[in-house]
């Protein structure tokens, strides 16, 4: 894998997208190339090409009906079938009520033997200044892990 990271996410009301961009900013601040990928704006095969080429894969999902977002689940199932190796992983997301998605995404990545950087940011409603600062810091940790690898 190259010294680059992908931040793969979907969003309902832009909160998870805002988090994704802040995490990407944190990763970029460490000198690691980063590509944010909005799932519904990209073809699955193109997403996987980037995933397989990256050292770190950070996945973001809003919580919908106590679950990760369906499009995120789809990407994770497809990713699992490709058996990616030697990946640093991260999970993050936003929620309104319960917020299970982050733990669910993290569990899926851990099951694929990703070296997880935890805990990932889990923010309720619209990210505020503190929440965005936590996302930038999380991205920095991901970038540092890529540089140390």
Kindly label every feature range from the protein language model.
Residues 43:
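Active-site loop segments of alpha/beta catalytic cores
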Residues 4, 18-39, 47-149:
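FMN-binding flavodoxin-like domain, especially the glycine-rich phosphate-binding loop
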Residues 9, 14-20:
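Glycine-rich phosphate/diphosphate-binding loop of Rossmann-like nucleotide-binding domains
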Residues 1-9:
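Metal-dependent phosphodiesterase/nuclease catalytic metal-binding core
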């Amino acid at each position: 894998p190259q010294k680059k990271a992908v931040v793969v996410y979907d969003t309902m009301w832009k909160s998870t997208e805002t988090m994704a961009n802040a995490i990407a900013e944190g990763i970029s601040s460490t000198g690691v190339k980063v590509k944010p990928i909005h799932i519904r704006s990209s073809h699955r095969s193109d997403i996987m090409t980037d995933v397989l080429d990256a050292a770190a894969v950070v996945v973001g999902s809003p919580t919908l009906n106590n679950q990760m977002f369906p499009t995120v689940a789809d990407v994770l199932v497809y990713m699992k079938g490709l058996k990616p190796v030697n990946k640093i992983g991260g999970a993050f997301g936003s929620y309104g009520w319960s917020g299970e998605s982050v733990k669910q995404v993290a569990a899926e990545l851990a099951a694929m033997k990703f070296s997880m950087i935890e805990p990932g940011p889990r923010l309720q409603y619209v990210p505020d200044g503190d929440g965005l600062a936590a996302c930038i810091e999380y991205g920095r940790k991901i970038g540092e892990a890529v540089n140390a690898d």
